[in-house]
Amino acid sequence: MRDNIFTHDVKPVKMYREIMNKDGSTSFEQIHGFHAVERASRNDLRDNGEVVYVHPSSYYPIQLEKLEEIAYELEGFGYKITGSGELKDNRLAFIELENDDLPNLKFDGTELNPKMWIGTSHDGSVALKSTIKVVDTWCKNTFMLNSASDILFKAKHTRNSTYRIQDYQNQLRIAGESIMEYYDIVNRLQDTKWYQSKNRKEFANVLGATMKPRKRKKDGKEFWTESMYSGKHANQLVDLDWAYNNSPGQVERGDTAWRWFSAVTYWADHMISDREIESGSNILNGTRARQKAKAFDIAKSYIVG
């Protein structure tokens, strides 16, 4: 029998509200049309569980046992499970897998290795998804490719959570094409000269930061400053500049568009609060994930030819 990847799992449970009866006593009445998603330990019967979300009764959460089942089936195709976790206050779960048949890319300051990422959420933000996560092992930077959600399997978010693993050769073809397309852009970014004078402007574009007069108060009197960035954005711009100059692999990459983009991915993955990591900010559709995607588009715009 296989060991569980996750210590907890989820299930829908009925919801009740407390009501006051005419005689002054209280009782409980079921709330129809909705149910709660309860996360509880698989092995501790004393665990009363926690409610992680509330949904209409028509919504059925995909259990983590199903995610494990998919991962174990993929192991039979040659994948290796390399990581797993829960984020967003236990509302999102994921498993990462590697496969030696998927292509890598290596040059000075960079070594890219792809992983398959499968995940599901209990708040409706991710049904059941598979995508490609590329890791630069020089600096542990990550980037999710915008791949179709049917690379590894076809799935339906229903009570039975049915899925069908794609043909293995078809998996490799679709994944390989997406990865090689990304690598081609990476190589072109590495061949694109970058001038550090562009850093502040383009980092600000990634953040959506704008310079404008700011209202301040001193000695009880309000006044307006000269045009400036907000305090938060000013600090983030300092961090991004540090990442461009000092994060692992940057010197080896030289002054290239790839170095600039790598500064953003390093900042997004490593110069981040524990709270942001827990919220999933740097994966899928989180704030920092969107900033990575925006930086990628900006970097690509500098490619000539």
Regions found by a protein language model. Give the residues of each.
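A broadly used, surface-exposed interaction patch
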Residues: 53, 78, 103-107
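Beta-rich nucleic-acid/ligand-interaction surfaces
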Residues: 83-102
